[in-house]
Amino acid sequence: MASDHRRFVLSGAVLLSVLAVAAATLESVKDECQLGVDFPHNPLATCHTYVIKRVCGRGPSRPMLVKERCCRELAAVPDHCRCEALRILMDGVRTPEGRVVEGRLGDRRDCPREEQRAFAATLVTAAECNLSSVQAPGVRLVLLADG
């Protein structure tokens, strides 16, 4: 009888462990950001214009209006997806055929892509849009490496 009770308790503990692992897996999947699902395609179109204006000095004559629109676009992206949205702004999205679509800051002779990327990575900061960005513990927003 005591043996059956131990088996029952052990089975319950194993079941709880399996449920905990399943819940953790579902939570981690929820934290992933999918373009077109968690945020729209090309969500930062105005931010592209703003980055070019600030870094390259080309574009609209009223950069503060463009900045406000960019910040609104970035604020509309869920905070846990902002790094991914900025990555898409800088690197675009590679299709299964290998084409790069959406976003993608271009390399220009008088305006290097790395300078554009460095500035784009600051859009969530207090000096620009003053937005939070949720990241995994110990992970910094590092968007300077070419994707």
Curated annotation (Swiss-Prot):
Gene3D superfamilies the UniProt entry points to: Plant lipid-transfer and hydrophobic proteins (1.10.110.10)
Tissue specificity as recorded in UniProt: Endosperm.
Keyword set, alphabetical order: Alpha-amylase inhibitor, Disulfide bond, Protease inhibitor, Secreted, Serine protease inhibitor, Signal
Signal peptide: 1-21
Keyword Cytoplasm listed: no
One GO cellular component term noted in the UniProt record for this chain: extracellular region
Pfam family of the protein (one): Tryp_alpha_amyl
Post-translational modification: Five disulfide bonds, which are essential for the inhibitor activity, are probably present.
Molecular-function annotations in GO: alpha-amylase inhibitor activity; serine-type endopeptidase inhibitor activity
Keyword Secreted annotated: yes
Entry-linked InterPro entries: Allergen/soft/tryp_amyl_inhib (IPR006106), Allergen/tryp_amyl_inhib_CS (IPR006105), Bifun_inhib/LTP/seed_sf (IPR036312), Bifunc_inhib/LTP/seed_store (IPR016140)
Subcellular localization: Secreted
Stated role: Alpha-amylase/trypsin inhibitor.
Family: Belongs to the protease inhibitor I6 (cereal trypsin/alpha-amylase inhibitor) family.
Protein name: Alpha-amylase/trypsin inhibitor
Lineage: Eukaryota, Viridiplantae, Streptophyta, Embryophyta, Tracheophyta
